[in-house]
Amino acid sequence: MSQKERPTFYRQEVNKTIWEVPVQYQNLSPVGSGAYGSVCSAFDAKTGFKVAVKKLSRPFQSIIHAKRTYRELRLLKHMRHENVIGLLDVFTPATSLKEFNDVYLVTHLMGADLNNIVKCQKLTDDHVQFLIYQILRGLKYIHSADIIHRDLKPSNLAVNEDCELKILDFGLARHTDDEMTGYVATRWYRAPEIMLNWMHYNVTVDIWSVGCIMAELLTGRTLFPGTDHINQLQQIMRLTGTPPSSLISRMPSHEARTYISSLPQMPKRNFADVFIGANPQAVDLLEKMLVLDTDKRITAAEALAHPYFAQYHDPDDEPEAEPFDQSFESRELDIEEWKRQTYEEMISFEPPVFDVDEMES
């Protein structure tokens, strides 16, 4: 929302809370809510398309909330890629910083997520190729900006009727230099180095998640449905084998080293015996993604060039992102200053320019 020409707002009650939005957003209808906000679908009368409007809940309630709000806005503003959710609009009914308390974010309305799709149908190998290719294409972009998503799972991957995919929910994403902050990812898709707090993790935590998702698309079953951290790790090691001593010795955590050294030795299984009937190229790619040693795990850019994606791979159409300045992560500011910086970011937002066919997808 730039302050050039402030739109007319109207008020509407949604699930016992008052929403105050520009008149261009009509037919507000609740579609979901979580800890950090609630979402309505709406008709954008300016463009004629359906959008998702998210009202952040108590965005400046505490320093943690205020910094999270700033982070989410900065991340969404930065993302301009077909396979990553981007910001169409951001607004507040407030007319000045003094009365600024509400933040609304507008993005594309995506119909289904990958969870719905897996439940409804067994996917063909060609479907799996196209879906995983798009996830990796989006990840190459995200990772090139030195951002780790850290919460990749089927419900964070939106898919439309044409099988076109966007990566959602950067609320938890952090800069690669950041250490673990506890609350990340649904455990089933979580890389073991995060789960066990091995600490030295990198962008390939997202590749582990893609491997788990790809295996699920191929088989129709969750790959590692662990009941808790220990059970999860046992399930992982039944497939990957126990880590070699060369990897254990590089773990900074004494507890992790001691615990893993105490486990009974398990050999790595032959993936072809686990994924019977799958395309051998798919199996080969899974073996390169589901590697315990993060230094040996394939990157998004490398995976895009894997023969499994031969019919989709185009090195000239797999863009990287502009560098993303995340020096703010180490800043300790008060609520009012985070709020002021969020307000500045909102005022300076320039909406993306879309072709009609892009909006229709």
Curated annotation (Swiss-Prot):
Cofactor: Mg(2+)
PROSITE patterns: MAPK, PROTEIN_KINASE_ATP, PROTEIN_KINASE_DOM
Keyword set, alphabetical order: ATP-binding, Cytoplasm, Developmental protein, Kinase, Nucleotide-binding, Nucleus, Phosphoprotein, Serine/threonine-protein kinase, Stress response, Transcription, Transcription regulation, Transferase
Recorded catalytic activity of this chain's protein: L-seryl-[protein] + ATP = O-phospho-L-seryl-[protein] + ADP + H(+); L-threonyl-[protein] + ATP = O-phospho-L-threonyl-[protein] + ADP + H(+)
Localization: Cytoplasm; Nucleus
GO biological process, one term: positive regulation of myotube differentiation
Top class in the EC scheme: transferase
Highest taxon of source: Eukaryota
Motif range (TXY): 181-183
Pfam families xref list: Pkinase
Positions carrying Phosphotyrosine: 183
InterPro entries (alphabetical): Kinase-like_dom_sf (IPR011009), MAP_kinase (IPR050117), MAP_kinase_CS (IPR003527), MAPK14 (IPR038784), MAPK_p38-like (IPR008352), Prot_kinase_dom (IPR000719), Protein_kinase_ATP_BS (IPR017441)
EC number: 2.7.11.24
Protein name stated in the entry: Mitogen-activated protein kinase 14A
Classification of source organism: Eukaryota, Metazoa, Chordata, Craniata, Vertebrata
